[in-house]
Regions:
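N-terminal amphipathic alpha-helix/helix-capping segment at the start of soluble metabolic enzymes
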Residues: 1-20, 170
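Short, well-ordered coil/turn segments that N-cap beta-strands
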Residues: 8-12, 47-48, 85-87, 106-108, ...
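Conserved, mostly hydrophobic/aromatic
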Residues: 16, 42, 46, 92, ...
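Glycine-rich beta-to-alpha transition loops that act as phosphate-gripper elements at the mouths
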Residues: 16-17, 89-97, 113-116, 182
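Conserved anion-binding
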Residues: 20-22, 57-60, 99, 105, ...
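Glycine-rich, proline-tolerant flexible connector loops at the mouths of alpha/beta enzymes
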Residues: 22-24, 48-75, 183-186
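Glycine-rich anion/phosphate-binding loops
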Residues: 24-43, 68-72, 115-120, 155-163
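Alpha-helix-loop-beta-strand connector modules within alpha/beta enzyme cores
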Residues: 62-91, 97-100, 127-138
Length: 186
């Protein structure tokens, strides 16, 4: 892929969840027309990227299958690329196969809430293909993350996590990485 996000200023990422069970919008954008309208509104309001999520990571919620996630995300991605060809699209997924399918359909960025921990194929895929990547700090899974407490120097713990994961990506010569501290997740 070898695409690089050129963000000369702080960027705004508009969130478009296409799940029936999202903790932030409760399935308001499951309909393709509603999703496109919301995308248009976010772009008009200054969003630099549209982040499509098809798998809710709400605690104590069943995780969608890979097939369900693809069925939710791919049609919306294709429609956005058709209606707003200049829009930059990010895909919120922790699955390598979903990331790969979406990049093949034109997504420019992957936003991974697991920081590469849930799918061992994610970081190698991202690194080998130099795909812009949001690396989020995460402890546990959506079911268990709120059971953990970080003892000691929280800043150091988070920095060490980022360093480990970035080292993997950088071993492939990949440096287009955005760090997300995972507030509320990690």
């Amino acid at each position: 892929m070898n695409t690089q996000l050129n963000l000369p200023h702080p960027a705004i990422m508009g969130i478009l969840n296409v799940t029936p069970d999202s903790f932030s919008d409760g399935g308001k954008y499951n309909d393709l027309d509603k999703a496109l309208l919301h995308c248009e509104e976010m772009l008009q309001q200054g969003a630099d990227l549209i982040d499509i999520g098809g798998c809710s990571t709400r605690p104590n919620n069943p995780i969608a299958t890979e097939e369900e996630e693809l069925e939710r995300v791919i049609p919306v991605l294709k429609a956005i690329k058709r209606h707003y060809p200049n829009a930059l699209v990010s895909i919120d997924t922790f699955r390598k196969n979903v990331a790969k399918a979406c990049v093949e359909e034109g997504a420019e960025n992957i936003n991974d809430i697991s920081g590469g921990l849930f799918d061992p194929g994610m970081l190698p895929y991202i690194g080998e293909n130099h795909i812009p990547y949001v690396l989020m700090h995460c402890v546990g899974t959506p079911e268990t993350m709120h059971q953990y407490s970080l003892d000691g120097d929280i800043h150091q713990t988070v920095l060490e996590f980022f360093q480990r994961q970035c080292d993997v990506l950088e071993s492939y010569g990949h440096h287009d990485i955005i760090l997300d501290p995972g507030i509320g997740f990690g």
